[in-house]
């Protein structure tokens, strides 16, 4: 036996039904769709969720609650350990300085400082939001926080 003698098992390969390719094919003319009617037309399938004219489930069930997603504030997040990288270069840390120094790529809806890590020296920080732990750590080394 050679590789060119190998054939698939009988009945394992089914030939594709090529419809609408002439009368000699056996599937020409009406292309297995029957005669007239909605199902024989192009785009003739009923929509997903169509229940024969009965009010669909999606419209029978009442709406509940609300979504506040469009008004959600998404802050650019910076930890205290990240502030240590530029603490020697600047006295006042603002969202704009962090953007210039490349610590923040996009300010989004503002800047929020979180308390991961320790701060080396006292600084003044201007930010849109700050966590309690970050506030305590900055104030413990004699720094000031201004919420803008």
Swiss-Prot record:
Which keywords label this protein? Ribonucleoprotein, Ribosomal protein, RNA-binding, rRNA-binding
Region called Disordered, residue ranges: 1-61
One GO CC term on file: cytosolic large ribosomal subunit
Q: Which GO terms describe its molecular function?
A: rRNA binding; structural constituent of ribosome
Q: Organism's domain of life?
A: Bacteria
A GO BP entry is:
translation
HAMAP family to which the protein is assigned, alphabetical: Ribosomal_uL15
Its quaternary organisation is: Part of the 50S ribosomal subunit.
Q: What does this protein do?
A: Binds to the 23S rRNA.
- PANTHER family the UniProt entry points to: 50S RIBOSOMAL PROTEIN L15, LARGE RIBOSOMAL SUBUNIT PROTEIN UL15M
The protein depicted here goes by the name: Large ribosomal subunit protein uL15
Recorded source organism is: Thermodesulfovibrio yellowstonii (strain ATCC 51303 / DSM 11347 / YP87)
Its taxonomic placement starts with: Bacteria, Pseudomonadati, Nitrospirota, Thermodesulfovibrionia, Thermodesulfovibrionales
UniProt lists the gene as rplO
């Amino acid at each position: 036996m050679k590789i060119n003698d190998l054939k698939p098992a009988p009945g394992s390969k089914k030939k594709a039904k090529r419809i609408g390719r002439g009368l000699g094919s056996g599937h020409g003319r009406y292309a297995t769709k029957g005669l007239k009617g909605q199902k024989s037309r192009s785009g003739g399938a009923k929509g997903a969720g169509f229940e024969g004219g009965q009010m669909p489930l999606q419209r029978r069930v009442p709406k509940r609650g609300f979504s506040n997603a469009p008004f959600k504030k998404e802050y650019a997040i910076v930890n205290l350990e990240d502030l240590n990288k530029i603490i020697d270069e600047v006295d006042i840390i603002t969202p704009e300085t962090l953007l210039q120094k490349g610590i923040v790529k996009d300010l989004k809806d503002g800047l929020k400082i979180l308390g991961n890590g320790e701060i080396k020296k006292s600084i003044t920080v201007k930010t849109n939001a700050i966590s309690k732990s970050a506030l305590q750590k900055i104030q413990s080394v004699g720094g000031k926080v201004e919420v803008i």
